[in-house]
Amino acid sequence: MPVISIFLWCLSIITFLILGSLFLFVSLLIPPARLHGLGRIACRIVLLAAGQRVQLSGSFPPAKDGPHIYMFNHTSLLDNLVVITVLPELTSAIGKKEQFKIPIWGSILRRWGAIPIDRSCLSEAIESLNAVGRLFDDGHSLLIAPEGTRSTTGQLLPFKKGPFHLAVTHQVSVVPMVITGAYESKHKGSWQLR
C-alpha cells in the first residue's frame, strides 16, 4: 500500500474517532432531529481527511413531500459518509446488524435512529421492516442500498425486494441516487485509498 494511502487512512481514522466521539457526546445534549447538520459536517470532514471530495449533481425532492426512500448504489466503504453529506433531511437508515457492533460507528448508527436488519433470521428481518413502517408513519425518510451489500466489481448487483416492497406497501416515493467515483477511491477487497 503506498505511503500516501497509509497517511490518508491514519488521518481519516483519527478524524473519525475524534468527530465520532464528539458527535456521540453532543447527541446526548440535542434532540435527534437536530443532528443532521452536525452529521453532514462531520462526514464531509472525515471524507476530506481521507482525501475525498463530494460533489452533488441534481437535486432532491422537497422534504415536505416525503417521506421518501433514498436508494443508492453501494460500491465502497465510503458510500454511507458520502450519502449523509448530500441528503437534505435527517434520514434513518437500515443496515446489516453487523455494522451496529463496530465501536463508535454502531453507537452513531443507533443514535441516528438506524435500524439493524438480520437477513439470516426471517422473523427479525420482518420486525426490522415493521420498524421502518413506523418511521414512515411518523413522517421520517429512509436511506437504503437496495443491493444489500457492497459490489466487488463496481457494477450494480441485483436488487433485494424489501426496499421496493416497503415503497409500495407504505406508498412512499423512491428517490434514486447514483454514487460515482467511490469504487475507484476505496472498493471492497482493497484497503488502498485513492
Predicted segments, located by residue:
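A conditional alpha-helix N-cap/helix-loop micro-motif detector
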Residues: 122-125, 156
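Membrane-cytosol interface motif
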Residues: 44-54
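A cross-family acyltransferase "interaction/gating" segment
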Residues: 104-106, 140-143, 152-194
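Residue-level preference for the first positions of well-ordered beta-strands
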Residues: 67-69, 141-145
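Anionic-ligand binding region
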Residues: 124-132
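A hydrophobic membrane-anchoring feature enriched in long, contiguous, low-charge segments
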Residues: 3-28
